Every structure is written in structure tokens, then in C-alpha cells.
């Protein structure tokens, strides 16, 4: 539908195609499958349909040349910059192919900023939106030395050039928007905050009441952990706390991950679930069966999975870092702990485990918050309006 907007704006969405970014690509595919709100969308994922030459380039650029062990400085081989440049070069290749085929676009949408690393000249001739969840602050805050900090300099400078060239920055959080202003005070690009769109699970309206009824009948509370990078997401902190506090005597823990964990060494009461695809029946079943969501992450910019917990009506245990407190509201929709603080994590688990009423109340508030802040229909309308504005419509 074009409506009163005249000719639609042709927008090209360039997606990095990794991890949670594919979830956003699925949203775009569904929300903009037809011309809607004056916008006609073409989307490309830079990791799809790689040519042999692109595979060779990815191997060369993303090959680690410096050990990334638990101790000592990291990234002295500029690995992060090389990987982000790879995403940018792949994106530029796809744009070039489309333009050679005669396609023209009124707006480019880069999701996230590394996909624009090789397209600064293009951004100067085609109005562009850059979608971010963080600046390089998310890695700088974990730097172990001055030398490591300096190794991220190329990323910091490239991000800055991209932010300045963009017509609009769309940030998932207030935290990331503030980081742009603080890290690049000379950047005059408008920035708006739009939390990631998250759909409510199908037929999930009664899940909270179901859980409370299970608890009334004496069912064992179930905790759910969902995370790909198990160590970075605090998975081993959770397992340590689980074993030391003997939570298996009064709760159960489901772990949804593809990280190579040896199931044979897991503590009692823990069930490992592998190979489950997002938004499938099996995925929804685990969210429905859970009573508490727990992700004591040590490294997170935003955390879409916390939004998914709220959408499922679950109280969440998260960490006090970056944008997480914008989603998990301490003592309202969940409990926040300091990253790596196992004593706080144990207390948070026990607090929620022991109180079905608290779980119900926090889960209800969490679902209400996600309905209001992450509604996919509203996100589509707001994003379409932003695209039209950038295009001058």
C-alpha cells in the first residue's frame, strides 16, 4: 500500500547475517513483504550465498593471528577490525551487484555499523540509516591493557566516520544513544531510540496463569538459560552456583545452547537442549515450561533474549551492565546482579524460586513492558516513517 505518500521509497536493508541479526532480518522480511507505509524494501544478508572468492576473503580477514586466551592482551592482530571490515566488504559487493543489475535505492539501512565499513562513499550519495546496539565501548570496557585498547582504534575511528556520514542513527537503547554522543561529541547526526521488535509467542496469553497454577500444585520451578556463547553469557557462573547451592534439590534448569558442553559433566538437575531454532515449536515449548529466565551475562550490549523472556511472561535475572537494566527493571520485571558475582546470583535465584507470587507479578509486568516497548507493528510504522524522512518524503 502506498497511500498518501506518492511513489514509494526504495530502501535496501543490509544485514550482517550473524546470530540475533537474522531475527531482525526475519522481522523485515515479514513486515515489509509488500510495499507498506510508503516504503518498498529489498534486503540482503551479507553472509548468504558467498562466492568462492568471498569465502577466501573471509578466511584471510577473520583468521586469528594472536592468541585469545584467558590472560594477557587480546586483539593485537586487529582481529576485530579485520572481521568488521570483512562484513563491510561483503556488503559492498552485494550493493555493487544490485546496482549493476540496474537497481537504484533512495535509502540504505545498515544493520549494524560494520556492514557500512566499505561504503562511506556510497553513504555520501545515498541517504543512509545506521542501526546500532553499541559503539566500540562494549569491547573497550573489557580491555586488559593500554595496548589492547589502542588495537581497537581503527574500529573506533571507522565507526565515527560512519556515524557522521549517516543521515540517521537508530539505536536499540538509551545507553547506546548516549554512547554515540559521549564517544563522538562532534557527531551531529540525529539519533533515535527504537528497541528491537519482539513478537509475543503465539497463544501465550495464559502462560503466566498456567505457571502459577503449576506452582500451586507443587510443581518444581524450572529455570531457563538461552545463550550461544556459553562462557560470555555467564553460563559457567550459573553452573557453579547451581552446583554449590544444590539447587537441583528444589528446582530444575534447562540450558538452550549450541556451545560444545559435555552433557556428561553437567550437575544434577540440568538438561541440555541443542539444535533448537528460534521461534519454532520446540523453542516456544521451553519458554512455556519455564518459570524463571536466567542469563548472568558478563558481556552484553543489549540482550534481545531478555526481551523474549518478557514477551513470554517470565521474570528475568540479568546483570547490571550497559543496556540490560533498560529491559530487566530491577525489582519490577526481574532481578539484576553484578556480572560474575555468584553470591548475588544465588540469592536472586532463591528469591524467585521461593515465591510463585513474585514470579507471577514480575512476569506480568515484564510482558506488559514488552508489549508497550517492542511492538513489531509500531516498530514497522516508526521505521517506515524514519525511512521516508531520510528520503525527504
Set out the residue ranges of the language-model regions.
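Membrane-proximal helix-turn-helix segments that form the acceptor-binding/catalytic region
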Residues: 149-169
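Nucleotide-activated donor-binding/catalytic signature segment of Leloir-type glycosyltransferases, i.e.
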Residues: 257-285
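A short, well-ordered alpha-helix in the C-terminal region of glycosyltransferases
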Residues: 351, 358-373, 379-382
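Carbohydrate-associated surface elements
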Residues: 175, 197
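Conserved donor-binding/catalytic core segment of Leloir-type glycosyltransferases
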Residues: 205-233, 239-244, 253-254
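Conserved acidic donor-binding segment of nucleotide-sugar-dependent glycosyltransferases
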Residues: 330-331, 335-342, 351-357
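Short hydrophobic beta-strand element within catalytic cores of glycosyltransferases
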Residues: 315-318, 328
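Aromatic "clamp/platform" in nucleotide-sugar-dependent glycosyltransferases that forms part
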Residues: 298
Amino acid at each position: 500500500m502506498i497511500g498518501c505518500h506518492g511513489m514509494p521509497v526504495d530502501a535496501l536493508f543490509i544485514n550482517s547475517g550473524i546470530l540475533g541479526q537474522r531475527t531482525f532480518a526475519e522481522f523485515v522480511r515479514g513486515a515489509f513483504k509488500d510495499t507498506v507505509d510508503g516504503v518498498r524494501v529489498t534486503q540482503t544478508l551479507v553472509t548468504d550465498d558467498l562466492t568462492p572468492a568471498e569465502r577466501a576473503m573471509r578466511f584471510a580477514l577473520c583468521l586469528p593471528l594472536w592468541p585469545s586466551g584467558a590472560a594477557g592482551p587480546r586483539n593485537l592482530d586487529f582481529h576485530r577490525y579485520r572481521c568488521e571490515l570483512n562484513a563491510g566488504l561483503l556488503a559492498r559487493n552485494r550493493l555493487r551487484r544490485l546496482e549493476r543489475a540496474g537497481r537504484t535505492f533512495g535509502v540504505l539501512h545498515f544493520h549494524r555499523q560494520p556492514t557500512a565499513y566499505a561504503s562511506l562513499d556510497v553513504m555520501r550519495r545515498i541517504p543512509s540509516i545506521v542501526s546500532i546496539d553499541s559503539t566500540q565501548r562494549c569491547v573497550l570496557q573489557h580491555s586488559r591493557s593500554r595496548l589492547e585498547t589502542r588495537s581497537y582504534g581503527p574500529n573506533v575511528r571507522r565507526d565515527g566516520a560512519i556515524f557522521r556520514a549517516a543521515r540517521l542513527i537508530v539505536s536499540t537503547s538509551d545507553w547506546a544513544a548516549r554512547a554515540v554522543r559521549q564517544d563522538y561529541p562532534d557527531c551531529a547526526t540525529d539519533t533515535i531510540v527504537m528497541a528491537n521488535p519482539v513478537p509475543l509467542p503465539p497463544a501465550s496469553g495464559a502462560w503466566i496463569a498456567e505457571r502459577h497454577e503449576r506452582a500451586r500444585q507443587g510443581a518444581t520451578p524450572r529455570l531457563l538459560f538461552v545463550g550461544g556463547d556459553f562462557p560470555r553469557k555467564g553460563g559457567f557462573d550459573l553452573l557453579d552456583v547451581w552446583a554449590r547451592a544444590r539447587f537441583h534439590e528444589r528446582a530444575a534448569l534447562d540450558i538452550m545452547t549450541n556451545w560444545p558442553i559435555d552433557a556428561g559433566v553437567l550437575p544434577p538437575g540440568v538438561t541440555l537442549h541443542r539444535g533448537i531454532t528460534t521461534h519454532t515449536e520446540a523453542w516456544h515449548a521451553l519458554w512455556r515450561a519455564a518459570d524463571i529466565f536466567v542469563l548472568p551475562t558478563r558481556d552484553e550490549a543489549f540482550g534481545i533474549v531478555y526481551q523474549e523472556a518478557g514477551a513470554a511472561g517470565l521474570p528475568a535475572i540479568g546483570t547490571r551492565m550497559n543496556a540490560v537494566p533498560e529491559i530487566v527493571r530491577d525489582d519490577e520485571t526481574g532481578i539484576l546482579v553484578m556480572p560474575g558475582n555468584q553470591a548475588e546470583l544465588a540469592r536472586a535465584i532463591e528469591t524467585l524460586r521461593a515465591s510463585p507470587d513474585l514470579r507471577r507479578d514480575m512476569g506480568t509486568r515484564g510482558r506488559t513492558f514488552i508489549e508497550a516497548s517492542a511492538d513489531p507493528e509500531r516498530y514497522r510504522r516508526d521505521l517506515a516513517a524514519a525511512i521516508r524522512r531520510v528520503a525527504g518524503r
